[in-house]
Structures are given as structure tokens and as C-alpha cells.
Swiss-Prot record:
The gene is LCR39. This is Putative defensin-like protein 185. Residues 1-22 form the signal peptide. One of its GO terms (cellular component) is extracellular region. Belongs to the DEFL family. It is found in: Secreted.
């Protein structure tokens, strides 16, 4: 009985403590590189109240790699 009470208490504590955590979500759209970094940050803040960065991505495809810029917007759900 004592062990099951301790286990129940731990489960309840875990559920309560994990329910208050903010989850991180993301959104993304194309941007034109570092010159649009400020626009990426402004749009991310306006749409989601988050932090946006314009990042270069490369897909190593044959015969030539594909590169593109994406605005990665990270925000609390």
C-alpha cells in the first residue's frame, strides 16, 4: 500500500509539472537571404510573437545541389 501511494504521488507530480511547460512550435517561409533578416524577424514577431532567422539550406542532390533560404520562425504554442 505504501509503495502504491508513493507511485501515485509521483505520477500526479509529474503530470502537474509537465502540463505547465510551453511547447515550441515552428513555421517557415522562403526569404531572399541575409538581406531579408530584419523582414523575417518582423514577420515572425507579427504572426506568432516569435523569433525568426533566415537560414541557408542545402539539399545535396545529383547532378547539382539545391540551395535556398528559409525564414525559420520559432514560437511558443
Amino acid at each position: 500500500m505504501k509503495n502504491s501511494s508513493i507511485l501515485l504521488l509521483l505520477v500526479v507530480f509529474f503530470v502537474i509539472s509537465s502540463s505547465g511547460e510551453a511547447k515550441t512550435c515552428s513555421d517557415g517561409w522562403t526569404c531572399l537571404g541575409p538581406k531579408e533578416e530584419d523582414k523575417c524577424k518582423e514577420n515572425c514577431m507579427a504572426k506568432h510573437k516569435g523569433v525568426g532567422t533566415c537560414n541557408l539550406y542545402t539539399i545535396p542532390e545529383f547532378p547539382a545541389p539545391i540551395t535556398y533560404y528559409m525564414c525559420d520562425c520559432m514560437f511558443d504554442c
